[in-house]
């Protein structure tokens, strides 16, 4: 079950490979995520010292958060992956044009997981081509549906 999707990711990037990782979260963050108070829109994954980190994910603290903890909504969160996967990703990210893009947050066995992808940035004309193709597919489906109805009558 998906908690939140980053719909902008498929618009801005060509998605190559998908990966799933665990997140190192604090207790108040888990409660806020379960309440749906999270945004992935401007977030991205970086490589630092041979580890992967998620930056820019905004988790709004609940008003009932503890008074002795000062929540930081935009803190850097570590991603949990096997060492072999991390080394493979580091090799691919160092290639020109590749980046790691968060796709969605979801639950797996009661734990919060992050789906992210190895993506290549789209240029403006690529975005236009994708949009044009989607419009054409939508129009084709509409015409075929209309034509099918006419034949059955």
UniProtKB/Swiss-Prot annotation:
Record's GO cellular component terms: cytosol
PANTHER family attached to this UniProt entry: SSRA-BINDING PROTEIN (PTHR30308:SF2), TMRNA-BINDING COMPONENT OF TRANS-TRANSLATION TAGGING COMPLEX (PTHR30308)
Family matches, as PROSITE patterns: SSRP (PS01317)
Keywords: Cytoplasm, RNA-binding
Cellular compartment(s): Cytoplasm
Name of the protein described by the UniProt record: SsrA-binding protein
Functional description taken from the UniProt entry: Required for rescue of stalled ribosomes mediated by trans-translation. Binds to transfer-messenger RNA (tmRNA), required for stable association of tmRNA with ribosomes. tmRNA and SmpB together mimic tRNA shape, replacing the anticodon stem-loop with SmpB. tmRNA is encoded by the ssrA gene; the 2 termini fold to resemble tRNA(Ala) and it encodes a 'tag peptide', a short internal open reading frame. During trans-translation Ala-aminoacylated tmRNA acts like a tRNA, entering the A-site of stalled ribosomes, displacing the stalled mRNA.
Predominant cellular place of this UniProt entry's protein: cytoplasm
Gene Ontology MF terms in the entry: RNA binding
Parts forming coiled coils: none
Alphabetical GO biological process terms: trans-translation
Short name of any one Pfam family annotated for the protein: SmpB
Stretches for region Disordered: 132-153
Gene3D superfamilies given in the database record: 2.40.280.10
